[in-house]
Amino acid sequence: MTYAPVHPSIAHLNADALDALVAAYVSGTSASAIIQRFKINIAPSRLRSIMPLRFANQVCEACGKGMVQGLPQRGASADVQGVIRCPACRHELTTACRCPHCRRQIARRLEAERAIRLAKIKEAIVAERDRYPTWGGTVDDMPLLVAVSYLALCRCCQPDELQLCMPLESSDIPFAPTTLLQDEMVQHLRKLGLISISDHSSPDASQLDARGFVFNPDKVRWQLRAESGLTLTSAIESAGRTGSWPARWGEEAAGVWMLVAMAECRQYFDHCARQRGFHCESDHAISVMLTNLLQDMSVAQCYRAIWFGARAAADFLVRSRCSRPHAANYMIGACQRWADHARADCWNVVPFKRNFDLPRSMISYVLFDVILKIGECGFTEPVGKMLRASA
């Protein structure tokens, strides 16, 4: 067996002795016994560092120098081979090699994979956009909810002269009270052909996986699709400023108000539950309860009912030592019972103020300030009365 130049401590050994030294070391013979047997002047702890390396009869692909093969781990079976490496550039014939050559190869491979992934994502963005025809109508053709959502998105995302918008997450004001309402409104605007995902979006904002094309509505950049997209924004603002609404908007106002009120109440309900470590899974039961409260209470008054319901659920958790899911369900009923008690005894329910941790959404600003011009009355006045008046 041919060895690379050996350490001075074992230079006195011939080829056969080196073979015997390697065999003894690999077989697991103690370092002290090996040192004594082969008369090596070295500390036992340094024995591995001076063991001879064999020429591997291979040329390094990185630098062209001859490679050597190290020893396998002590006690390894006979078919286990040592790692082949280059003594000049430290390249190893392993998947774990991180020499400069391998790092460059990995970087090139990752860059190629990234380019392929980005190309596929752009294809998916184009295909997604082409699923829905471009909006060709005017403001008069828009339902009130669509007009409010469109203007709110434009105010959050600040489209430029090319109608390219910033991501929703860049806005200091949230688009909608809840993620659910935001996603529903964004999806609705996409299906109407008013907006589409821009191929200028960050690569991290979307991906292709087993579910197909998946994107984060908060992180992608949006493109206004209508040729007069910015003109539509101005037309909606003008309709709100002058009060010259499409006839249908007046009929739809109470329903849109109710939708925003429900979202704001649900946002506060989830906030109170989260503060107490509750996770309510019964979306239907929560929606039924909030709908009942909003029949004669404002959002601000519902905040008070929800707060007392959350406090009662926390007390119930301590008193009964029940599970948190049980207490979370109790919270729903506690909110309803508090509201029923308030109605039965004709309480003057003092409204809460907005929660500092739950800032007013852009949809609320557009609906109540720009279109309806009632400001925070959308928060402090009962929507149920308007619903009954419009029925």
Question: Residue spans of the language-model regions?
Answer:
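Cysteine-rich micro-motifs
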Residues: Q73-H101
